[in-house]
Amino acid sequence: MSSAAENGEAAPGKQNEEKTYKKTASSAIKGAIQLGIGYTVGNLTSKPERDVLMQDFYVVESVFLPSEGSNLTPAHHYPDFRFKTYAPLAFRYFRELFGIKPDDYLYSICSEPLIELSNPGASGSLFFVTSDDEFIIKTVQHKEAEFLQKLLPGYYMNLNQNPRTLLPKFYGLYCMQSGGINIRIVVMNNVLPRSMRMHFTYDLKGSTYKRRASRKEREKSNPTFKDLDFLQDMHEGLYFDTETYNALMKTLQRDCRVLESFKIMDYSLLLGIHFLDHSLKEKEEETPQNVPDAKRTGMQKVLYSTAMESIQGPGKSGDGIITENPDTMGGIPAKSHRGEKLLLFMGIIDILQSYRLMKKLEHSWKALVYDGDTVSVHRPSFYADRFLKFMNSRVFKKIQALKASPSKKRCNSIAALKATSQEIVSSISQEWKDEKRDLLTEGQSFSSLDEEALGSRHRPDLVPSTPSLFEAASLATTISSSSLYVNEHYPHDRPTLYSNSKGLPSSSTFTLEEGTIYLTAEPNTLEVQDDNASVLDVYL
């Protein structure tokens, strides 16, 4: 499925322009779809319900609808055509799994004319949307329809295990035959609701090779941008609360592994972004063609069809991203890197591409010219890993838990420093008390040492006594362990040492001259921050 056609916008002012597909007018295709589905679903309701068997996946029912009508079919003004239904019982089970009742299915498709979307895909497929905005109908190629038939048993098993998925939800596969032309169509879920304006739409593959919207695409009213455009516009990515982010990545990982097991690659993530802040400021002009059927929009008929349901999200507004709003249409709440509130709508599209021989050849010749890891077409395992890495690292990001503000940190650190400093001061004060008492006790020995030194000056025949190495080491240890600090602003050329001891301020001086240590003490006139401080000067 092409992302360009998923914008959910009908062609404004071009209702009279008739398009053709395989030389068949689009109006004839729409009419045949409604007539054929109306007949086959109505006929299926008469069959008893039973378990799906393996052979049911390969059953093809056919009915001929002539323009003049028949006993089983109504008359119509389109050319005669034959309508085929593939695996009707299997698809009936799929519809029941998603809560789609036969009456609702018929009402959505057959009650009102189908709306043709203005943006056809690169493959030239036609896209129609039902008037109630529930279903997308797309024309597919023969190989795509054939691949979907082969995929059905595994698809059935996967849906049983995980009905909540971002993979396309297929509700029917049909074929219209007229004039020797086969037109195959598939009915799927509508990823982007038309009633919610998409300010940006992206088709993301995780590739960089030619992944930028063309000039022609950019000129459209609602262009679909690509990977390089996203990296330029949303370079910081999209942010989710932790719970939503984990649910989204878990769903993407599981879906990619399923596609890898089916050898599917070249798929895309169709991403629609709605800015809530913009929608509050702007008044969107809605015409009856852009507004879904008011009779049916009171409730969502299809289960697991919204983006929020598809990722197993709880539907809560995490981390204050978005307030409870009934008009969110099931979008996933997120924020831009600028803090803007967003609603995201997404789904994996274009899964009917298997890694067949032609794709292998396409990758081979592209890899010869360009970097093989950057091209879109790649082997399924590498494609899945690259796709997930791109989504996880460049597109979707988790909002980190709020950290404490700097002011709070500063207050806490100051309080801690105050408490620590009080403990240190108290400890130093007690230590200095003890050491001061010891120094005063030892002062007498220093006094006698002074007298001996003075006497030696008058008696040159005597050699001044010097303290032993043990005493000198003891003194050095006492001074170094006293937790002193230096005041460089002391008005002398010598450094001054302080301690926080109680008592009157005083100054004591140790002087080493000619191998003799002198201790002098004098009152301290220096203003110290602590009233109970004393000064100890050491001159060496």
Curated annotation (Swiss-Prot):
It comes from the Eukaryota. The keyword DNA damage does not apply. Residues 25-395 form the PIPK domain. GO terms for molecular function: 1-phosphatidylinositol-3-phosphate 5-kinase activity; 1-phosphatidylinositol-4-phosphate 5-kinase activity; 1-phosphatidylinositol-5-kinase activity; ATP binding; phosphatidylinositol kinase activity. It is found in: Cytoplasm, Cytosol; Cell membrane; Endomembrane system. The modification Phosphoserine is found at S445, S447, S448. The keyword Nucleotide-binding applies. SMART domains: PIPKc. Its EC number is 2.7.1.68. Keywords: ATP-binding, Cell membrane, Cytoplasm, Kinase, Lipid metabolism, Membrane, Nucleotide-binding, Phosphoprotein, Transferase. Interacts with RAC1, AJUBA, PLD1, PLD2 and ARF1. This is Phosphatidylinositol 4-phosphate 5-kinase type-1 beta. It comes from Homo sapiens. The lineage of its organism: Eukaryota, Metazoa, Chordata, Craniata, Vertebrata.
